[in-house]
Regions:
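FMN-binding flavodoxin-like domain, especially the glycine-rich phosphate-binding loop
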Residues: 2-132
Length: 132
């Protein structure tokens, strides 16, 4: 059963987004398709952030964050994973989380770095599942 109120937002990491969405009964949505209406109608967001090799956010995620930060996020729940990139971008990811919080969002988990040898996607999904 899919819950329209939970969205896994991704850029090019569809396989990971689909895996998370399937396990949570959520919908996977490309960040390129993110609209004000999506944000208003959704309660929980799982963001699959991606960085380019130089450490900059992808242009699609720059658009996505601009869209998210233009909205009132009060009462919205967020979990964040980094689909491509590593701990070097941790400062940027924490800054993004802080900006979401300033707009009223609640961040419910530690950041998962999918490319890290220490990451466990199933454990992370299990940890966020009751909170999402």
């Amino acid at each position: 059963m899919r819950h329209e109120s939970i969205s896994v937002i991704y850029d090019s990491s569809l396989a990971i987004a689909d895996e998370i969405a399937d396990k949570l009964g959520a919908q996977a949505l490309s960040v390129q398709s993110l609209t004000q209406r999506n944000i208003e109608s959704c309660h929980s967001f799982i963001l699959g952030i991606e960085f380019m090799s130089g450490g900059d956010l992808t242009s699609c995620w720059l658009y996505g964050f601009q869209m998210l930060l233009s909205q009132n996020l009060k009462g919205k729940v967020f979990a964040v994973y980094v689909a491509s990139g590593n701990h070097r971008e941790h400062v940027v990811v924490k800054e993004i989380c802080n900006m979401l919080k300033e707009r009223g969002a609640r961040i419910i988990s530690d950041i998962l770095y999918v490319d890290s040898s220490q990451s466990n996607l199933d454990e992370w999904i299990g940890a966020i599942s009751p909170k999402i």
